Amino acid sequence: VNMVDRVEVMRGGGSALFGSSAIAGTVNIITKEPATNSASLSHSTTSIGGTSALDNITMLNASLVTDDHKMGIAVFGQNRQRDGYDANGDGYTELPTINSQNIGTRMFLKTGTYSRITGEYHHLQEYRRGGDSLSIPPHEANIAEEVTHSINTGSVKFDYFAPNEKHRLSIFGSIQHIDRESYYGAGKNPNAYGGTTDLTWVAGAQYNYKFDKCIFMPAEFIAGVEFN
């Protein structure tokens, strides 16, 4: 969340303007855009339930912007190591162990006074393990839930604004690849392993025009096309 600027929630059929499949609503996570030259590094350690189980989180943020503000880049990274937590001492975790790394970047380039290109890339690598006997393979434990995710996401967008601010054209594309390996089983079942690989891409364009007066009131016309 250290790169999140705001979260926009839109309910109802009007959300289809943001995507052809968004018929019930959308949740848009808007990431921060680089505005100044800055860098920060932080680390926190939390004891879970006052025990020796620790949650360690290290975060890095940095941004660089040219003097004329025509180009900028922001990068972030997070490393999290959380121990499994057994609240009642029965040998089974209530909170799984977590080992995750998250990195990403957002950059922009102003190609003209009224146009710009924005690009983003995010990578998430996460391992979770819950149950008992966390130090041995999951199929040797009595109960085990183990999931490993590797997610890569990238997007690029071109925006053009007319000098009179009435016309706007956006051309966009994004792609995401997910690799997931899991184990959900009990009784030392060796056949409870699973795996999933998925590739998703979206590309499209959107045109907006603002009417100062349409019949008797201001209005906005929106048209677009999307492929996935």
Give the location of each predicted region.
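Membrane-embedded beta-strand positions of outer-membrane beta-barrel proteins
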Residues: A39-H43, I73-G77, T105-M107, G119-Y121, ...
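Transmembrane beta-strands of outer-membrane beta-barrel pores
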Residues: T45-G49, T66-D68, N79-D83, H123-Y127, ...
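Transmembrane beta-barrel domains of outer membrane proteins
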Residues: M10, I30, N61-V65, F76, ...
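N-terminal periplasmic accessory domains that precede
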Residues: V1, V9, S21-S44, N56-N61
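Hydrophobic, lipid-facing positions within transmembrane beta-strands of outer-membrane proteins
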Residues: G25, A39, N56-L60, M71, ...
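Short loop/turn motifs that connect adjacent beta-strands in outer-membrane beta-barrel proteins
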Residues: P34-S38, T66-M71, T113-R116, F161-R168, ...
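Flexible loop and strand-edge segments within Gram-negative outer membrane beta-barrel domains
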Residues: R82-N102, F108-K110, Y114-L169, Q176-D198
